Regions:
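Glycine-rich phosphate-binding loop of ATP-dependent small-molecule kinases
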Residues: 5, 100, 109
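A domain-level signal for the structural core that forms small-molecule/cofactor-binding pockets
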Residues: 90-93, 110
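Residue-level marker of regulatory loop/turn positions in helix-turn-helix DNA-binding domains and
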Residues: 97
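Short cysteine-rich clusters marking metal-coordination/redox-active sites
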Residues: 105-108, 119
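Cysteine-rich micro-motifs
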Residues: 116-126
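Ser/Thr- and Asn-enriched, surface-exposed coil loops between beta-strands
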Residues: 70, 115-116
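Flanking scaffold residues of small Cys/His-coordinated metal-binding clusters
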Residues: 100-103, 113-114
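Long, charged N-terminal interaction/targeting segments
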Residues: 1-91
């Protein structure tokens, strides 16, 4: 829970139950709903995202409606609470990480083929 608290305080959009009053539930984060092998990838995304959100003064308006794995790739659905258009460099950043995710093993985070969910080592162990 302390790790979740740290992450949510640094990246509030990781809180799956964030409301417009910024009331946080520190019991889990969006990271908990995603493949564990993508953790470093998502944290890298969040670090770069925070820089851009700070640049545009959008940290308090930024939300993630859903983050999931689909067809071996990250899908990150975000929006701004005031209904304004997302800055293009934020859109581009999210797309970059969605693309990168298809080459990261969902179990261990190693490099993998884009046509399989896991690297060769994890496939041998788990499948």
């Amino acid at each position: 829970m302390e790790q979740d608290r740290y992450l949510i305080e640094r990246y509030p959009w990781l809180c799956p139950y964030l409301d417009d009053n910024n009331d946080y539930d520190y019991n889990d984060t969006l990271l908990d709903t995603l493949p564990s092998g993508w953790r470093d990838l998502i944290l890298d995304l969040c670090a770069e995202l925070k820089e851009l959100l700070d640049k545009y003064d959008l940290v308090d308006k930024y939300r993630v409606a859903e983050a999931k794995e689909k067809w071996f790739m990250l899908r990150w659905y975000d929006y701004l609470t005031d209904g304004s258009e997302m800055p293009q460099d934020i859109v581009d950043l999210v797309m970059k990480y969605e693309e990168q995710s298809q080459y990261v093993c969902v179990l261990c985070g190693s490099d993998k083929s884009s046509t399989k969910p896991c690297c060769t080592s994890c496939m041998a162990i788990y499948y």
